[in-house]
Amino acid sequence: MTSYRNGPDAKGLFGRFGGQYVAETLMPLILDLAREYEKAKDDPAFQEELAYFQRDYVGRPSPLYFAERLTEHCGGAKIYLKREELNHTGAHKINNCIGQILLARRMGKKRIIAETGAGMHGVATATVAARFGLQCVIYMGTTDIDRQQANVFRMKLLGAEVIPVTAGTGTLKDAMNEALRDWVTNVDSTFYLIGTVAGPHPYPAMVRDFQAVIGKETREQLAEKEGRLPDSLVACIGGGSNAMGLFHPFLDDAGVQIVGVEAAGHGIDTGKHAASLNGGVPGVLHGNRTFLLQDADGQIIDAHSISAGLDYPGIGPEHAWLHDTGRVEYTSITDDEALEAFHTCCRLEGIIPALESSHALAEVFKRAPSLPKEHIMVVNLSGRGDKDMQTVMHHMQQESKA
């Protein structure tokens, strides 16, 4: 059987997706980074230090929790939550940041830059930069700054400089463009800490590997609790790192159904969504070839989602490839469906999920009722919802007016 876990190839390609579409000035740096990462991967001292920080700083392993009340509510499949929201900084983002900051230090870089949408990757990057005493600059779109004030303040508290990006719609895509510009001009001193499984090779593979701790733990924890593999896995997808982290260790287990959930915003047919696989076409953005939201002239269309973390017009190249091969099923959930799932999880489990994770929960609530009681579903609760209070309050006020 051909493995789904061998990618990317030497050129950083997953089938027809991925690659290294960057400015010539960045090419030596990218190749150097790929070499350093391969070395670090095989270095027991690096892995040991990574394991130490994952355990004592991040708080891993994160629990795999049987959601008894949600299971009863759906009346079908047995629902488990992988509790990534309990990590230090409140989401899965820190898994990748700890890995990359150790790599940056190993490469002698003194300045860290990153892009952020919901602010969670920005907070996680500022956190690890503070811990290792490195200068930190975060690029964030003005639209996202407005809807994520608390996270902006957190980043500043942690010593990071937050640079507002006014270009475009002032969201994640624009922040990433600015970060790439910065990197080109400060190649020698600067390490670009990308927050998702996108960007030029080696980033998609590197971020996936640092996030794969999610899926590895899930395998072990479920073996302990149920003595077997799950029947299905569900995770939300913006760029797709929390999903890739859960999915990757299970890709070669044919009996495990895998479902990625994109943001359908107001609905795919309205054009106001962030579902690159369900509503996009292949193209090149931010250093890699993948599915993108584009108009007839190939211009990138602005994505929309109630959740700032899913509001990206592309998707990681490995997801694009898994979609091509049919190994993973990709669906989408609207803003309203995600909000409903958010409220259900709050009321029934006493857990306030991020709006991103609520998209995955909504998909679970659609599927679980028609599945047998012995069917085991694992959903990645990728982050906590503290950052989304303003958005949810605003929505509830709008609804009460209507």
From Swiss-Prot:
Organism of provenance: Pseudomonas aeruginosa (strain ATCC 15692 / DSM 22644 / CIP 104116 / JCM 14847 / LMG 12228 / 1C / PRS 101 / PAO1)
Disulphides: none
Function: The beta subunit is responsible for the synthesis of L-tryptophan from indole and L-serine.
Keywords attached to this entry: Amino-acid biosynthesis, Aromatic amino acid biosynthesis, Lyase, Pyridoxal phosphate, Tryptophan biosynthesis
Highest taxon, organism lineage: Bacteria
NCBIfam families reported in the protein's UniProt record: trpB
PTM sites of type N6-(pyridoxal phosphate)lysine: 93
Entry cofactors: pyridoxal 5'-phosphate
Reactions catalysed according to its record: (1S,2R)-1-C-(indol-3-yl)glycerol 3-phosphate + L-serine = D-glyceraldehyde 3-phosphate + L-tryptophan + H2O
A biological process from GO: L-tryptophan biosynthetic process
Protein name, per record: Tryptophan synthase beta chain
GO function term, MF aspect, one: tryptophan synthase activity
Keyword field contains Lyase: yes
Lineage of origin: Bacteria, Pseudomonadati, Pseudomonadota, Gammaproteobacteria, Pseudomonadales
